Amino acid sequence: MSETSPKLRAELEGIPTYKPGKPAAAAGPVAYKLSSNENPYPPLPGVLESVASSVGSFNRYPDMACSGLMSELSERFGVPLSHLATGTGSVGVAQQLLQATSGPGDEVIYAWRSFEAYPIITQVSGATSVQVPLTPGDVHDLDAMADAITDRTRLIFVCNPNNPTGTVVRRAELERFLDRVPSDVLVVLDEAYREFIRDPEVPDGVAIYRERPNVCVLRTFSKAYGLAGLRVGFAIAHEPVAAALRKTAVPFGVSQLAQDAAVASLRAEDELLGRVGALVCERQRVVASLREQGWTVPETQANFVWLRLGERTLDFAAACEQAGVVVRPFAGEGVRVTVGENEANDIFLKVTERFRKEL
């Protein structure tokens, strides 16, 4: 038998493996997972009932067009069906966008540090990442991002709020940036955490999309809606882009379970957003407590907080795990910590208080 292996694409060799948030391992009687920005609340009863009604049809393929969900989204956002596309979470839709726009020789711009899937899916597409450092305040440097545009730029990600820092881009600076972007470059406003924003100066990406044909908005049901395990996200974009997204979608990628749960969640939006409000209040408590302890915390508008710890990052993550909470470390930089159950947040704050005294 030949020892020659099948030939694979050379650009795949350098792709880092995506690192999900570490699961909660029992460090004590109770362990809490604050590493993946998940919603700590279980699905609403109505959502569970909707999912249960789909169980008997597992032998059938899902509605490939996501017709029911698309209709609900069209009504909810006031956009034409032709301006919508769905996928397996917003990261799945982001990958479809790259497949539709970018390839070898093209460039994709995004802030760094930002969502860690961006470099992975960019490299998979064959395009080149152009990473623009955040400002010292951990905010997108939009002027530098605009300066980085070349004739090879095909797509720009703006993560708003930014993951993992929670910081935001406000309306005036975003509009100035968009004015500098050529009309043939697609700007993707990744708004996975949109529902947690309380700053009135942060624009709704859908309003921006209505005014600018080269803007696409990404949303997900994973965070505020609590459907992370079902993998459903969507894009709102003008027809040429949305049509390309539908062409690059994995056939039958969004399960019927996910579609039905997403529709039920949209219909129960008021109740779900009440839960989001409770998480925002808890976020404010956590941030205030950290600042009282002497920590410098960026102004977060997401469901997580960011602590810069530099070389002490892994030590801090280990201390949290030993106490019974799992956080998301970025070695040499800092930790991202989800705002979770009140009990979990209290444990985290006890660790930060002890650790602060050791610095």
Swiss-Prot record:
One of its GO terms (biological process) is L-histidine biosynthetic process. Signal peptide: none annotated. One of its GO terms (molecular function) is histidinol-phosphate transaminase activity. The keyword Cell cycle does not apply. The keyword Transferase applies. It comes from the Bacteria. Belongs to the class-II pyridoxal-phosphate-dependent aminotransferase family. This is Aromatic amino acid aminotransferase. The lineage of its organism: Bacteria, Bacillati, Actinomycetota, Actinomycetes, Kitasatosporales. The gene is pat.
